Design a protein with these regions (language model features):
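Short, compositionally biased segments
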Residues: 4-7, 12, 188-193, 200
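SF2 helicase/translocase NTPase motor core
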Residues: 5-7, 12-14, 21, 25-181
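Conserved helicase ATPase motor motifs in RecA-like P-loop NTPase domains
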Residues: 78-79, 180-198
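PAPS/PAP-binding and catalytic site of the sulfotransferase fold
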Residues: 87, 194-203
Length: 203
């Protein structure tokens, strides 16, 4: 909390996002708190390298926006093609940076994502730690096998699943993503059920 005077001049607490310290922060302490919330990389994307013909127009529009933003969320209902959009986002980053991209999926979905890649001509490999310069696919539970500095992009499939993880796992995922310059969250069930799940998304 930080102190602020209300209209009558009496002090009252004002919540600072994520702050738990008591009143009376020094300027340096508050600045350190703000700095701790800054993103590692500056935001901003790039002009898409490719928007393949197999995409529908609305998918191209969403991807053009997401790639130019660099950090985005695609909230699309079931059946609207989130998997090909994830693959194209990751493939664009690989082509732009010549560095690997990582797609995180629920346990039962990683093999399906690889098959979708084959269907659409995007090479994607299921991996448990061996990384290649291309689209790597793994499940959330294996994230600890990877180094975030190896990747230019990370894509979270069914990102609403993050709220179901216990605190340490959720924190590990958000800290991993925080280091990676290009990020995409995808889900069909976007509504956060609590302020903590909304905060996880914004990180």
């Amino acid at each position: 909390w930080v102190r602020r005077e209300d209209r009558e001049g009496s002090p009252r607490g004002v919540a600072v996002a994520g702050a738990t310290a008591g009143e009376g922060w020094s300027v340096n302490a508050y600045q350190n708190f703000v700095n701790s919330k800054l993103q590692v990389e500056s935001s901003g994307g790039f002009v898409p390298v490719t928007l393949p013909d197999f995409l529908f127009d609305f998918q191209k529009y969403l991807l053009d926006w997401a790639i130019r933003k660099g950090r985005a969320a695609i909230l699309a209902d079931c059946g609207l093609g989130k998997t090909p959009m994830q693959l194209v986002f990751a493939d664009n980053v690989v082509r732009h940076t010549n560095k690997p991209a990582l797609i995180l999926t629920p346990l039962a979905v990683s093999s399906q994502t690889v098959r979708e890649g084959e269907k659409f001509g995007i090479e994607a490999r299921k991996t448990s730690g061996d990384v290649f310069v291309g689209v790597n696919v793994t499940n959330y539970e294996k994230l600890h096998h990877f180094n975030p500095n190896d990747f230019a992009a990370v894509v979270c499939d069914e990102s609403s699943i993050l709220k179901s993880f216990e605190g340490t796992t959720r924190q590990a995922i958000t800290e991993f993503m925080r280091v990676v310059p290009y990020r995409l969250l995808c889900t069909a069930t976007a509504a956060p059920s609590s302020s903590s799940s909304a905060a996880t998304w914004t990180r």
